[in-house]
């Protein structure tokens, strides 16, 4: 077994020009902690990185010199975020509370837009269903059925086994309003954590008073990015066309106008779809407010 590991190790070095490939799981000051074959290597970056404006992020796959503990190259990213500074996220669980805090379609659409713009799969995870009455719950799930129809996964935090399956072999983040139930969900996934609200980082191995840094952990056959939380997107970084294209259902209604923003034209196919109840009215109104911010 040991000989096999040595051979695999040597093959990897040969394939990568003498360097090893790993993933940055934590950055503290100028030390970048690279995970490789079950070990953690505190590495520094090549001096030329600064000159070339290369900033390694948590989540980056890199080539590094195992002996000198130097990161030689940052490999291409599938995506990257500025706040927090992370990369290569596969999916985001948008923890969506139905009460305390109240259900917000505006926030939900804003987070969905954020993930679409970054090429991240979004999973809507519903919490606190027991705090709303049956009639209100039915109305909310009628709305959520629309999100299912346009391609989003909607799941209850009670469906633990399905969530575990979704976590497998993926790099995930949990995001949502403060108090939406992220700690409660982690407790359900792993009762041994016994988390109090706001103690996610402590359960993952941090002291209560440590400075918050982004960190990537192994979690249920996948990886979980523990972050201070995703900020709302800065709309000025994107064009109105970017935002339009990130509303995935609009493409189902081809508009006769080239580069139509679906705001004014009377014959616009998207506007017609809203009137015909084929596009959720609240989602269209949120779209209008988002592109207004992007001007």
What are these model-derived regions, one by one?
Residues 30, 53-62, 66-68, 75-92, ...:
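Helix-rich effector regions associated with P-loop NTPase G domains
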Residues 3-103:
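N-terminal accessory targeting/assembly segments
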Residues 72, 153-155, 225:
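General small-molecule cofactor/ligand-binding pocket signal
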Residues 171-179, 183-186, 214-216, 221-225:
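Conserved active-site beta-strand-loop modules that form the wall/rim of enzyme catalytic pockets
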Residues 183-195:
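A conserved segment at the C-terminal end of the G1
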